[in-house]
Swiss-Prot record:
GO MF term (any one): GTP binding
Chain sites annotated for binding Mg(2+): S173, T193
Name this polypeptide is given: GTPase Obg
Organism the protein comes from: Mycobacterium tuberculosis (strain ATCC 25618 / H37Rv)
GO cellular component, one term: plasma membrane
Principal location class: cytoplasm
């Protein structure tokens, strides 16, 4: 069973809004109480929240489907439905959210950072909210909108100050275990490290984190070996350290060629974040070189031989042995100083304020195009939303939809394009036979659907009239 997962594809479905209620107020001595249907509750959204106690995306590996609660339906007596609860999902710090096309949606850094992955649908209006001066007793209500549904890719990019890179079996895991309390798996065969290992290193009053990235080989930036899957974990590292095995017996390898090969792979790799968080490109990050395994006599000689050549590149060079712990303290304090210098030299990242992007107010645009089969297709945010809100089992609701489309100008545009009575018109997922409200060329008269003529009448039978009527019925019965 995998213990560390740093890339998953998940399926999110926010809650749908509740349906509005169509009801009439019923109360003693109030025969015409009017509409009192409540609105439906909004659907729950799916929100990612950064939790420092979460370190992997393993939970999403086994449960990739996330569904939020839907809103409750409205009820009579002007009672609105309850809103669906938001589904808050905990993710590790450093999680990057990508859409289906690979576009970056969010870079979640910092405890408590939130991102709305899928928005809940709006609740439908009840007939009380639909009542107006000309529509005093609507016999229908609007349906709730569907919640947002989409597939997302989550990638975890480790947050560490120092990233250790090197060929397999260079001693990176041994170095992490020697300078920190981390206990990574260590063995004498290549690719022992299959997941990044993090360790916290203390340097006097300061502390920093070190990430051990699985071994790289030539072509890692193009997907060879394990490098492409784990190179993303060094994107956030402030300092990159080349760990070189000076005791290797492989032909054609030496410290200089190993460093050049690693630099080639780093130069070919394109980070997803593109210098976000003010870290800059990988090529601009400070470097250090660790010549490892100098406890072997031949390795010590080789390290001393190439040390000056590497130092000419302007990189600090440390000759260490994780087996005997030789020169580990100079390495620890040297890396701590490099991190401090780099952080002091780079510009201070200005905290980004949360950006609220409201739903566009002007969504009245629409297009009408022939479908090639004698029908027409109407596209537009507002008409498609109205279709989803309409209960087609209610004739009055369908009439209300026709009025809304006519006011928007859809009927006029269909007539202009030569639409005839009975032709197929598709809006969203609904296809129906179109019937114009008025003949072509005549103005569209907006009817007050949902009106009740009894509400406009003041003719009510009083107590005296009812008493007289009872007397007449008695007399008629006696006769």
């Amino acid at each position: 069973m995998p213990r560390f997962v740093d890339r998953v594809v998940i399926h999110t479905r926010a809650g749908s809004g509740g349906n509005g209620c169509a009801s009439v107020h019923r109360e003693k001595f109030k025969p015409l109480g009017g509409p009192d249907g409540g609105n439906g509750g909004r659907g729950g959204s799916i929100v990612f929240v950064v939790d420092p106690q979460v370190h992997t995306l393993l939970d999403f590996h086994f449960r990739p489907h996330l569904t939020a609660a839907s809103g409750k339906h409205g009820m009579g007596n002007n009672r609105d439905g309850a809103a669906g609860a938001d589904l808050e999902v905990k993710v590790p710090e450093g999680t990057v959210v990508l859409d289906e096309n690979g576009r970056l949606l969010a870079d979640l850094v910092g405890a408590g950072t939130r991102f709305e992955a899928a928005a809940g649908g709006r609740g439908g209006l009840g007939n009380a909210a639909l009542a107006s001066r000309v529509r005093k007793a609507p016999g229908f209500a609007l349906l709730g909108e569907k919640g947002q549904s989409r597939d997302l890719t989550l990638e975890l990019k480790t947050v560490a100050d120092v990233g250790l890179v090197g060929f397999p079996s260079a001693g990176k895991s041994s170095l992490v275990s020697a300078i920190s309390a981390a206990k990574p798996k260590i063995a004498d065969y290549p690719f022992t490290t299959l997941v990044p290992n993090l360790g916290v290193v203390s340097a006097g009053e300061h502390a920093f984190t070190v990430a051990d990235v699985p071994g790289l080989i030539p072509g890692a930036s193009r997907g060879r070996g394990l490098g492409l899957d784990f190179l993303r974990h060094i994107e956030r590292c402030a300092v990159l350290v080349h760990v070189v095995d000076c005791a290797t017996a492989e032909p054609g390898r030496d410290p200089i060629s190993d460093i050049d090969a690693l630099e080639t792979e780093l130069a070919c790799y394109t980070p997803t974040l593109q210098g976000d968080a003010a870290l800059g490109d990988l090529a601009a990050r400070p470097r250090a070189v660790v010549l490892n395994k100098i406890d072997v006599p031949e390795a010590r000689e080789l390290a001393e031989f190439v040390r000056d050549d590497i130092a000419q590149r302007g990189w600090p060079v440390f000759c260490v042995s994780t087996a005997t712990r030789e020169n580990l303290q100079p390495l620890i304090f040297g890396l701590s100083q490099m991190i401090s210098d780099y952080n002091a030299a780079r510009p201070v990242a200005v905290p980004r304020r949360p950006v609220i992007r409201p739903i566009p107010v002007d969504d009245s645009g629409f297009t009408v195009e022939p479908d090639g089969h004698g029908g027409f297709v109407v596209s537009g945010a507002r008409p498609e939303r109205w279709i989803d809100q309409t209960n087609f089992d209610n004739d009055e609701a369908v009439g209300y939809l026709a009025d809304r489309l006519a006011r928007l100008g859809v009927e006029e545009e269909l007539l202009r394009l030569g639409a005839r009575s009975g032709c197929a018109v598709t809006i969203g997922e609904m296809t129906f036979d179109w019937e114009p409200q008025t003949p072509a060329g005549e103005p569209v008269a907006m009817s007050g659907r949902g009106t009740d003529p009894r509400l406009d009448s003041n003719k009510r039978v009083g107590a005296a009239e009812r008493k007289a009527a009872r007397s007449r019925r008695r007399e008629h019965g006696d006769g």
